Amino acid sequence: MNSEKISYPKQACACAVSLDLLGDKWSLLIIRDLFRGKSTYSEFLKQSQEGIATNILVDRLKKLLAMGIIDFRRASHDKKIKKYFLTDRGIDLYPVIYEFQRWTLKHVDFDYTDNTKNWNDLIQNTPQEEV
């Protein structure tokens, strides 16, 4: 576990810093996919309907690794395969992903995937804490 803080050289508000570090679509979708059980480059590339380009996937994985949000282990059956996982720092982003999804389901009319439908059904039956 990396408890050392991420260095950020500019003076800014916390919201601006977090958006600068994590606010791009692909980083958040990789984090979402890790929460959903995906763990390999191939799974991120082929099993996400958003269709991330290979160069962007490589870049974002490196960025998330450098920030200590994810890490990897080599697969036991094939040492060439990296199995990515969320670190404690990455797991701390769960409420962010959760609230983005909850906000979208509440305020945006869109055609959503089976994963989103299942997740929505689950949270409809989960008591919400007052913020």
Identify the role of each PLM range:
Residues 47-75, 79:
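Canonical helix-turn-helix DNA-binding module
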Residues 42, 62, 82:
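Residues within the helices of the helix-turn-helix
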Residues 1-13, 17, 21-25, 47, ...:
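Recognition helices and adjacent regulatory flanks at domain boundaries
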Residues 36-38, 63, 90-91:
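Short, charged/polar surface micro-motifs in flexible loops or helix N-caps
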Residues 95-131:
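Amphipathic alpha-helical dimerization/coiled-coil segments
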Residues 13-56:
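N-terminal helix-turn-helix DNA-binding core of bacterial DNA-binding proteins
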Residues 23, 76-99:
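Basic, amphipathic "hinge/linker" alpha-helix immediately C-terminal to the N-terminal HTH DNA-binding motif
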